[in-house]
Amino acid sequence: MTHRHVHPVRSRAGALSAAAVLFAAAGCASGTTAAPGDAAGGAGHGGTLVIGATGKLPNPDTVIGGAGFEGKRLVGFQIYEGLTRYELLKDTDRPPVVTGALAESWQVAADAKTWTFTLRKGVLFQDGTPFDADAVVFNLDRYLDKKSPEYTDALGAAAKEYAGSIASYRKTDADHVELVTKEPNGHFPEDLAHVLIASPTAVKKTGSANFSQHPVGTGPFAFSSQAEGKEIALVANKAYWRGAPRLDRLVVKSLPDAAARTAALRSGGVNWIEYPNPDDIDSLRADGVQIATNSYDHLWYWILDTAKAPWSDPRVRRAANYAIDRKAIAEKLLHGTADPAYQAAPRATAAYDPAGDTYSYDPAKARQLLAEAGLADGFSTSVTVPTGGSGNLLPVPIAEALQRDLAAVGIKVELRTTDWSTLIGAEAKGQVALGSDAIAQSTTLFQSEALLPLFIGSKSPFWTGHYANPQVDALLASASASPDRPKRQADHRKALSLVTQDAPWLFVVNDRNPRALSPKVEGLVQPQSWFLDLTTVRVRA
């Protein structure tokens, strides 16, 4: 049996009812919801779903680069699967749990590092290649073994985010693999939902460099064609192991401009848009368009460079947080499609405690804190803001509202705009795009739990804000090492409470994940998640 040891890779990567779909359109047909756990049903009856995305579309290799979680949601998790997956069709009043995908079960040894996965039998890649333990080892070699002919530095850097904890891996027999982590990792099964598995046959045929032109996985939809960065077309995988999806085809189009997305929906150019312009929601509803929302693990915020004065002073950071009117942004600018974020923990997470809501709108307190910090006359600063992209809502209008609020207490902000790919590309290198003092962005902290240390841990490759608190690092380490989920949640709650008090970020809003759907679209189940299971969706003729 071959046993693989991982060679180090330098990281550069960067309340609903249980079965309800939150379709709030008056006078139009409500969305049909599949019964939790039901197979999706046969393909060939569901039409073509055309989705207008908010950002540039991803490179559809298994690491799904350049488009954030929107690219993974709409493309990556449709073509590929990992050993595990999120259960997105059940319990939509709480964050989703991880269940088996290409692995049907797993066990962890007493050392809390050695994991044995029992693989699902009878699964085929979309090119007909059987899935087995050799396929798992092949893909891990591609990500982690610099001696593999299919390894590239780009793959290795991107895979580090979720596969970086793996020390070694091996096939024990055709249906089992053993993965050993460098340290105890209680959230390892969740990490593996993001370590996507490609067909070895397809990768060998094209080579890693060209695989994104002909990607092949085991997911519910198979690749058909693409116009790079602009449009990706997929077709139903009729041999999908969970049952063929109801749709015949899935097309994802890049439409970064919110007005263009709404126009495309009204004209019939698309029948689903991600993040409709909040100003358009009432008129869309009046036209019979369905608006789906749900709370999820989301935070829109500014990362402040705490290594630079005056953001190095926690009094200044707290002052900025008291200076902004989150409620006005959520209710007036975003028309209720987001909730105010008064603390670091997003509302739709186990780490959220209402008692931790801290930063009410209090300009007088903001001025007092600035005076205590010796900045009674205020100061000037800069922030880089994306013009759109994954989960970013209306980034420029939000930033302009924050700019006005901060100016009222003497903090003069220069806004510098760039595209989402440039911003996250710089962040993946631990840099701030355009040399600003802060960056604006959206993020998830818990999908998976591996992400939390990337954003608040002092050893993160994404250390753009240079925030460091030894107590936070210790709580993160304690949580990561524990297989006990309630203990991890308690540690995370304590860590984010400290982050709230330290205020290394400007906490703004928690998105409610709105999307607008044609009345002909049926069957969406909207979970408390960035991700979606599209197998239950169909489009009526």
Cite the ranges covered by each PLM segment.
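Surface-exposed binding/hinge segments that line
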Residues: T118, V137, D153-A202
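N-terminal lobe/hinge region of extracytoplasmic solute-binding protein
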Residues: G52-A110, V216
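Ligand-site clamp/hinge motif
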Residues: T206-S212, E231, N237-S283
